[in-house]
Amino acid sequence: MKSSLLCGALIIINTKLLYLQGVPGLLTCRHRDKDFLHGGLDGLDPRIAAYITDAGLDGLLRVPHMDLDHALITALVERWRPETHSFHLPHGEMTITLQDMEVIIGVPVHGLPVVGYTSPRTSWSNACAEWLGCRPPDRQLGGNKNTAVMEGPRVKAKWLEDRFPNPLPVDAPDALVQQYARFYIVEMLGGRLFMDKGGDRISIMYLQFFDPISNGKRYSWGSAALSWLYRHLCNASEKTAKQIGGPLLLVQLWAWARFPHICPVMRHPQQALPPGPLAIRYVAC
């Protein structure tokens, strides 16, 4: 109901599109948030949590699980203008900024630009073995379907998840703890920030910035994620678009923060300082 109210309040339908193309449907919102991340920082093995904190991504881990409102996101995409990178609303222009990225979902925005290589020193299979301790099997062909576990830097998410069962063994050596931490990091980055249209695969390319793991806090992940979001919003604003990726939870939380009359119930948890990101204030409905 709230999404419908927002659509009525914010959307002025393009009449040419309405009569020539028909009313566009809802966009498919690509987002992956695995069950083992739902417990946040407090629900994680403290050995893994320590490494994620050292990587500077503990704020993102604190963001609670929420279902995406496809209607809300579609309504906002309808008002997105690629030429200005902003939402054109009846009362003026608004956009999502780096401040929103840091304050709402706790992603660091200060540091070096996220610029690396797209081809590893040897092969992505070797890189996966080095960073995560597991080597994907060789390419297999089943009929006309490519069943390869790894394509470039992208690994089948289910295969990778099966390599890291919960819980972490009590007597796990530090090398295994670091591999688990890198797995959680790549799941957070690939599922919450840099989600693309290939929902069954996840890229390990980001792990080059976490060698060692503490090196990750030197980079502005918020800047990279915001650029990725702008790209997906621009692509999704095309009339032929059917789906959208990127940090869509930020888009939803941004709308809740900017239009409080449509947000669900807010909570004010009793927590020790420093407080977590703004996202923890919302109870998804």
Tell where the protein language model's regions lie, with residue ranges.
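Short, intrinsically disordered/low-complexity patches at protein termini
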Residues: 127-128, 134, 253, 274-278
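Extended, charge-rich alpha-helical regions
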Residues: 146-166, 256, 261-285
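Short, charged low-complexity intrinsically disordered segments located at boundaries
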Residues: 130-136, 215-220, 241, 256-264, ...
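N-terminal leader regions that mediate targeting or early regulatory function
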Residues: 1-230
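Amphipathic alpha-helical segments in well-ordered regions
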Residues: 192, 254-257
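Hydrophobic, mid-to-C-terminal alpha-helical segments
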Residues: 200-253, 263-273
